[in-house]
């Protein structure tokens, strides 16, 4: 592990190029109340030199007023930003923090441990690549620990760092550590995790967080940060079929027409055959345009403008996908919901469903079952209350293009929006695509379009800000 150097060390241009090209890992911290999630993130920020002098001064002042570490600096206050959190010593909202090393950039979400904030945790986990599940070494696995392991599994996170915290308070006992690891592995066996990496640490003292600790001579593996630097990122998304929801149609003049968006999965190159959903029109990629020039290939996570060889009618909400594995068109979905609204969800409820860049009307046709968030077992249900997880069938007012969530997290997820308040009511994961009651359009191709680039300086400046490759 190396902490990133200052820009003065080797020049600003080189510094910017180095950090622009680094991979980004999004991860969440979760666990029971007072397991030390916020302290762990504070330690990562502190020991990777991400805190400015004025923040240190403010932290020392706040530690005297709100701290829980006696006379010592309370690193948790770097993350617990709400007044209610500081006064209660708990995390309520999802707090996002950013930091980087020479090897990788990180976006970390500190998610709440209380049951009543399950919806907040689901929000933080929905975009994460990895979960850091904290366990207090004194208490071992708790009901909340198991609940969070199940939730991150349901949300498609396949890699877990089991951070057994406060090991200094149990004398760095190897027996205690191994007992917790064994219990977690037994519970997580049916949860389909591809990797569980157990790390003993002390977030308060910094042992095995950024730098190796010296107290546990029996632990010879890497500290937490080194694991976060080395774990594979987005490997499943890169291997998945190409998908790009259209954010806007880029047509600055009559000679140029392209479709701009963020590639959700897979990769694409000029000459590749693609299908535009929901129209079913087919074409090939003529150009991959960015403000910095054309690309020979673009992949997951890049914002680009795709120019097609044919004049295809598409707008915001459409999805461009590889013709080898097109999306399914449907107006009915079986969805697993993480219900966040205070009012109960019952059959007949009318909401908006936002899928990618498209928003449609959705009616709850049926509520089938509720999932116990501690055991994963399903039971019959006719409604969902706040923080419930359940399976429902949605009927939409028109066809949309989707994948099952197990195949693609981006094109297989949605949010439900309350039509009266416009509040987010639920996070939804597509479990099964129900056969559509409408006839899907036949794939067709159209008139060849011009692939000549736009030459406007103003356009290029705008593209560099918004859709630079």
Curated annotation (Swiss-Prot):
Residues 31-38 are annotated as: G1. Gene3D superfamilies: P-loop containing nucleotide triphosphate hydrolases, Translation factors. Pathway: Sulfur metabolism; hydrogen sulfide biosynthesis; sulfite from sulfate: step 1/3. InterPro entries: CysN_GTP-bd, CysN_II, CysN_NoDQ_III, G_TR_CS, GTP-eEF1A_C, P-loop_NTPase, SO4_adenylTrfase_lsu, T_Tr_GTP-bd_dom. GO terms for molecular function: ATP binding; GTP binding; GTPase activity; sulfate adenylyltransferase (ATP) activity. Keywords: ATP-binding, GTP-binding, Nucleotide-binding, Nucleotidyltransferase, Transferase. Pfam families: GTP-eEF1A_C, GTP_EFTU. SUPFAM superfamilies: EF-Tu/eEF-1alpha/eIF2-gamma C-terminal domain, P-loop containing nucleoside triphosphate hydrolases, Translation proteins. The keyword GTP-binding applies. GTP binds at residues 31-38, 110-114, 165-168. Its EC number is 2.7.7.4. Residues 202-204 are annotated as: G5. Residues 22-237 form the tr-type G domain. Heterodimer composed of CysD, the smaller subunit, and CysN. Belongs to the TRAFAC class translation factor GTPase superfamily. Classic translation factor GTPase family. CysN/NodQ subfamily. This is Sulfate adenylyltransferase subunit 1. It comes from Methylorubrum extorquens (strain PA1) (Methylobacterium extorquens).
